[in-house]
Structure formats: structure tokens, C-alpha cells
Amino acid sequence: MCIRDSYEGVSVFAGVGERIREGHELWHEMRKSGMLDKTLMVFGQMDESPGVRFRFGLSALTYAEYLRDSLQREVLFVVDNIFRFIQAGSEVSSLLGRMPALVGYQPTLTTEVAEIEERIISTDRGAITSVQAVYVPADDMTDPAVAAVLGHLDTTVVLSRGQAGKGIYPAVDPLASASKMMDRHVLGDRHYAVAQGVREHLARYRELEDVIAMLGLAELSPRDREIVMRARKLQRYLTQPFHVTSAQTSIDGASVPLEHTLSDCEAFLRGDHDATSEDACYMRGAMDTATETSA
């Protein structure tokens, strides 16, 4: 894979409260992909005591800091799952007899989250970039634990049950996801305009879904029908066959350069692919291959 071959940094994986079976499977997958020589894996397994699980996240971060500061390496710090780190802290708090705070969480919730998040920084010696899985209880984004974590993140990618139910994989909800980098001065005028245009189409389609379910497409205005048609194709275009899932899906992985993605989205917004079938946009990668199989 191109990322594996070109990546010159090191990765630290922190499995906080990870199931033993899942950790074992991940280790074998990493060995099979040839990434173990660039990866450090730290597990605080779910059968460990709350104190051990709570400290393991901080221990893994200490390894990442050593690689950054002493070896001057670029570090990718992956945490699965940061919510289990918070849960372990809550269990420790209960054992210490502390009075619970909001929704039963520990009174030191924000302090404990900040203790790990604020150490993930770049220095003149190297950088730590972190990717963290955040479990959302009952899909409630306002949960105190979730809110405490999200406040420290630059970008949030929300995986939606609704998207998965439609067969959209990865099941990313573009409207619920957000990034501090989504700024015209950071992205440039073209990238920002394309992103906003895609979001506007998807947002309008979501507003009209209930109307379509009750009355059908025929009751929409010509402009709304056009937006819905293009939004549905954009939704399918944003699916991506992953290299790591090719063994399960029998679909070869595809990587699409940013320039191709922007050009394809511009073409959708202009209506260049209005004659292309929705199926031709699904799991295809770049549209230059999709149009060849359009209906």
C-alpha cells in the first residue's frame, strides 16, 4: 500500500479497555501488512483493573512522547477507545468514594481528559498526530464525556447508523462531521466552495427526505428534484473501497487524489453526471472509471 511504503514515522496504538480477541486479531493484521516494525502496541485489556486501564492510555502517550522528543520521530498516536479511558477513570473515582457529577461521571472528568489531550502536541523535535475512536453513548453528542473529548479535537468524523443502513461505507455523516481546517484561508477558495456546495446539496436532500417518503419525487419542484438527484449521486460517490477491507468485500481498494475528488465534485454540482446512474457512482473511486459503466 502506498501509505505503508511512504510513511517514515512511527505509530503508537493504545488499546484502552480493548477486548483480548480484538487486540490479538489486530496484532496479526499488522504483522500480515508488514507494519509491525513501525508500530508500538500498548494494551490495557478489558479484564484488567480500572486503575490499570486508566493508566495505560497515559503510558502509551509517554511512549509517543519519548519517540517524539528523544528519537525525534513523527508519531501517529491511535487510541481505541478514548471513552473507555474515561470509563476507567469513572470506576476509579467510584472506588475512591468521590461524589459523581453530571450523568454519573467523575467530578474530575474534564481534568482527566485534558491531562491526556493537552500532551498531544508538536515540538521543535517532532510531532504527535492523534486519531481517537470516541464511543458515543446512545448516539448523544451532548454526553459530558463526549463533549469533553470533542473540545480538544481539530476534526471530528462522525460515523452514522443511518448511513450504514443505506449501505454507505465508510458510514461518514458529512453534515455531522466538522473540522477547524474548514476555512477559506486554509483550504483556498476552490476547495472551500466545492465543500460548501456538496454540504448544501446533502443538507437540502436530508430536509426533503420525509417529503419524498410521503409524497414522492413528483411533488418536488424541478430545482429540488435536480438537487436530490445530484445529492444521491454525491452520497454514493463519497463511498470508498478500502484496501484493508478488500479481503472481506472482494472489492479492490482505491485511493483518489484530492485534485480528482475536487474535480469530480465540481462535475456533480454542475450536472455533468446527471446522465450517470447512481450505481455507477458507488464504490468506484474516481468518476473517470464510473462514467464508463453508467446506464
What is the predicted role of each segment?
Residues 1-3:
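Short, small-residue-biased leader/transition segments that mark boundaries at the very start
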Residues 8-11, 37-40, 71-76, 125-131:
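Loop/turn-to-beta-strand initiation segments
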Residues 18, 33, 70, 123, ...:
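Residue-level signal for short amphipathic helical patches enriched in basic/charged
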Residues 53-89:
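Phosphate-binding/switch loop-helix module in NTP-utilizing enzymes
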Residues 62, 66, 84-85, 91-295:
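Conserved catalytic/coupling modules of large nucleotide/cofactor-utilizing molecular machines
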